[in-house]
């Protein structure tokens, strides 16, 4: 048998872990945005065949679920765990921590809100939020509704901030993003959009921390007001029902 006919020995199999796969996926998302982390792309990044990735994650959705858990698991619970701090300060600390942590990986944010967040780290964060709202005096039902409202606001705000930047990679500094938005609004004809022109500086700052906290504080004040008036129906709900009845009778 000639040397060329001899069977080739296979090299040692590449060792692989779930953490390596998730690291590679997050790197690809950071570099190329939400479409960059395909199974083939992840496999190429870690130097294995796609089948090796499928051994740990059956599809991209499973990789995304793992990434969601990875990112939520990196949230610092100490910033809102101190029971001696007022509950509003603790909710604000959680909201700011989530914004800072997730905005560091803008390519992952659209994937996070595109599917369920129901892993252990997500459930733990939800439990902590329910505890905070319970400390505010809300009953379990209102605490759950308020928690959902806060989750929608926090993740929705982060998603809109990320979507405002039309290129992959890390978010530019806040001042740069606000300036870019101001330039875009200034280019719009003020005779067609006079109110927008008047409010352009405020609208440009929609992506600012100041705006984020402004909205959060209004929500927290609304939650507090709802608790203070929980013995009777909410005026807005009463108006809505009355208006419908009057419209129907007319």
Where are these regions (language model features)?
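Short hydrophobic clusters on alpha-helical segments that form packing/core surfaces
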Residues: 21-29, 67, 71, 98, ...
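Amphipathic alpha-helical interaction segments
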Residues: 20, 62, 93, 124, ...
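Hydrophobic alpha-helical connector segments
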Residues: 77-124, 140-141, 147-150
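Helix-turn-helix
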Residues: 20, 24, 28-62, 66
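Non-DNA-binding regulatory cores of transcription-related proteins
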Residues: 186-203, 207-214, 218
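Hydrophobic alpha-helical bundle segments that form small-molecule/ligand-binding pockets
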Residues: 125-149, 154-182, 204, 223-226
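N-terminal intrinsically disordered/low-complexity leader segments
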Residues: 1-16, 80-83, 191-202, 231-250
């Amino acid at each position: 048998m000639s040397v060329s006919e001899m069977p080739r020995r296979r090299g040692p199999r590449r060792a692989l872990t779930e953490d390596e796969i998730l690291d590679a996926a997050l790197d690809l998302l950071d570099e190329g945005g939400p479409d960059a982390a395909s199974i083939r792309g992840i496999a190429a990044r870690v130097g294995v065949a796609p089948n090796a990735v499928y051994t740990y994650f059956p599809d991209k959705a499973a990789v995304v679920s793992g990434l969601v858990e990875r990112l939520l698991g990196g949230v610092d619970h100490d910033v809102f765990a101190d029971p001696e701090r007022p509950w509003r300060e603790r909710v604000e600390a959680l909201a700011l921590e989530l914004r800072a942590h997730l905005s560091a990986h803008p390519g992952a944010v659209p994937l996070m809100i595109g599917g369920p967040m129901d892993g252990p780290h997500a459930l733990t964060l939800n439990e902590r939020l329910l505890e905070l709202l319970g400390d505010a005096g809300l009953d379990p039902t209102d605490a759950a509704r308020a928690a959902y409202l806060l989750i929608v606001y926090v993740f929705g705000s982060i998603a809109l901030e990320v979507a405002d930047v039309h290129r992959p990679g890390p978010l530019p500094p806040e001042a740069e993003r606000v300036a870019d938005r101001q330039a875009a609004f200034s280019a719009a004809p003020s005779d067609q959009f006079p109110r927008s022109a008047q409010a352009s500086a405020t609208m440009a700052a929609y992506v600012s921390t100041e705006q984020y906290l402004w909205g959060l504080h209004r929500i927290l004040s609304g939650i507090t007001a709802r608790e203070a008036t929980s013995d009777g129906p909410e005026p807005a709900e009463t108006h809505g029902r009355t208006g419908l009845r009057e419209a129907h009778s007319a």
